[in-house]
């Protein structure tokens, strides 16, 4: 027996303590067989390679008809290339077939170590056939097989990783399929508004969810207010045109500088599906508006508009500008110029009022053409939402100044025309007075002559 299986009984031959040598030989055989089931050939990670003499048909039980592995693979390829031949063209009952193999193995499993070795080899070949049917023979390497056998480190069931690869003869995935597969692998889904979110277990992160609350930079100590920063706003700071790095983003979010501050921030963003690579460089110039969150920038624009409306001396400025051109020949031309300027300014205001740049937790539907909307969105992203409302407030103030200029010119023209009319009427009355006196004197003289 030692000459036939020298590698299986060497442990039993070195024992000389008088124990049952056949029992020790059987234990050594079981240990060798157990080690051989986890060893794979270097040629194929999922193929159990042995010599032809070890798997001769006399070593199998009589109730099982052994089919070599290459015949099984040929039968599998023929069935899949001609699905009309096989009743189960889509391998829906592959699990049922594997259970039948398992029952056949255990029903006819021998007790001696030779048939035990052959039975374990048959189990390995059945597992290879099942993996072929599941479409993972050419898609995974040896370490992937160990992940499928014991469960992956990502907490997924092994069957969830059995995805068909391009080596199985399937059609290449298009751009949409590739994007969908990447989103599925990364756990990223798209909400109804087009925002990028990532699945975390069973919960779904919404871009409108609160990321943190930030104290204002421009508020006084007596009236400090906090502004809510959403996940969508953080994503806008990390995206073009700014592409802020971890240091600048930490400054905006008022995070204290620490040794691992950048790494902690990147890990938190990664859990939310946002990528902030280490060593990133900013893409835009840093201004004072860069340090403001969108809530504070909007608050600043609103206060600026209120101050312009209530405190700017629009009447005094308009009258001062109108008095510079009070000549009679220039007043008509000035009125036409002011009316044309008011019309152009109104058109500009109407355009800015239709801006639908994403801001805060809102992502409105665009109204303008995308050619002009993308430029307005770029300006809004650079100014953190301050730019467009501030310009609208300035244009409204300018409209008020133009209206005051027009009112002053019309009032002055009316006053001049009224004075000229009054002076002309007085001159006519003064010319008619001597005539009345002469006629009255003539009438008196006529009366005296009649009496005489």
Swiss-Prot record:
Q: Does the keyword Transferase apply?
A: no
| GO CC annotations on file | nucleus; transcription regulator complex
Residue positions, PTM Phosphoserine:
239
Biased composition regions of type Basic and acidic residues, renumbered to the chain: 429-452
Give the chief site where it resides: nucleus
- Look up keyword Ribosomal protein and say if it applies: no
Q: In its UniProt record, which GO terms are filed under biological process?
A: inferior colliculus development; negative regulation of neuron apoptotic process; positive regulation of DNA-templated transcription; positive regulation of transcription by RNA polymerase II; transcription by RNA polymerase II
Residue ranges of region Disordered?
A: 416-452
Ordered alphabetically, the record's keywords are:
Activator, DNA-binding, Nucleus, Phosphoprotein, Transcription, Transcription regulation
The Gene Ontology terms for molecular function here are: DNA-binding transcription factor activity, RNA polymerase II-specific; RNA polymerase II transcription regulatory region sequence-specific DNA binding
Q: Could you tell me which residues belong to the region H-S-H (helix-span-helix), dimerization?
A: 280-410
List the InterPro entries hit by this protein, alphabetically: TF_AP2, TF_AP2_C
Per UniProt, subcellular location reads as: Nucleus
Family label:
Belongs to the AP-2 family.
Subunit composition?
Binds DNA as a dimer. Can form homodimers or heterodimers with other AP-2 family members.
Indicate what this protein is called per its UniProt record.
Answer: Transcription factor AP-2-delta
What is the source species? Mus musculus (Mouse)
Q: Which lineage?
A: Eukaryota, Metazoa, Chordata, Craniata, Vertebrata
* Underlying gene: Tfap2d
């Amino acid at each position: 027996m030692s000459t036939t299986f020298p590698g299986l009984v060497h442990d039993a031959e070195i024992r000389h303590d008088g124990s049952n040598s056949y029992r020790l030989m059987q234990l050594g055989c079981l240990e060798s067989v157990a080690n051989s089931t986890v060893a794979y050939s270097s040629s194929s990670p999922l193929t159990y390679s042995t010599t032809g003499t070890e798997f001769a048909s006399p070593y199998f039980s009589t109730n099982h008809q052994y089919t070599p592995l290459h015949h099984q693979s040929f039968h599998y390829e023929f069935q899949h290339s001609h699905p009309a031949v096989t009743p189960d063209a889509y391998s829906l009952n592959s699990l049922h077939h594997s259970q039948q193999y398992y029952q056949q193995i255990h029903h006819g499993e021998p007790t001696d170590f030779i048939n035990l070795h052959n039975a374990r080899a048959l189990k390995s070949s059945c597992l290879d056939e099942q993996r072929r049917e599941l479409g993972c023979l050419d898609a995974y390497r040896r370490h992937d097989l160990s992940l499928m056998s014991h469960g992956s480190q990502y907490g997924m069931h092994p069957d969830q990783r059995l995805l068909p690869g391009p080596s199985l003869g399937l059609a290449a995935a298009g751009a949409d399929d590739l994007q969908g597969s990447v989103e599925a692998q990364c756990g990223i889904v798209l909400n109804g508004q087009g925002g990028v979110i990532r699945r975390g277990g069973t919960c779904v992160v919404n871009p409108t969810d609160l990321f943190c609350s930030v104290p204002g930079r421009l508020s006084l100590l007596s009236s400090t207010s906090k502004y809510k920063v959403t996940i969508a706003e953080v994503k806008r700071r990390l995206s073009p045109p700014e592409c802020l790095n971890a240091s600048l983003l930490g400054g905006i979010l008022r995070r204290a500088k620490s040794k691992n501050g950048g790494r902690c921030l990147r890990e938190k963003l990664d859990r939310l599906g946002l990528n902030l690579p280490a060593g990133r460089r900013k893409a835009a110039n840093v201004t004072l508006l860069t340090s403001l969150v969108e809530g504070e920038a909007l608050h600043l624009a609103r206060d600026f508009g209120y101050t312009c409306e209530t405190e700017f001396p629009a009447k005094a400025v308009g009258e001062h500008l109108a008095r510079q051109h009070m000549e009679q020949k220039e007043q008509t031309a000035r009125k036409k110029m002011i009316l044309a300027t008011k019309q152009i300014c109104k058109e500009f205001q109407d355009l800015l009022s239709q801006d639908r740049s994403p801001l805060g937790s809102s992502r409105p539907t665009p109204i303008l053409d995308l050619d002009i909307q993308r430029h307005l969105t770029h300006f809004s992203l650079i100014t953190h939402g301050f730019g467009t409302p501030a310009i609208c407030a300035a244009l409204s103030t300018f409209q008020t100044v133009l209206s005051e200029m027009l009112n002053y010119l019309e009032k002055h023209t009316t006053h001049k025309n009224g004075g000229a009319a009054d002076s002309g009427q007085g001159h006519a009355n003064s010319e008619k007075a001597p005539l009345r006196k002469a006629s009255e004197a003539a009438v008196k003289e006529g009366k005296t002559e009649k009496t005489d």
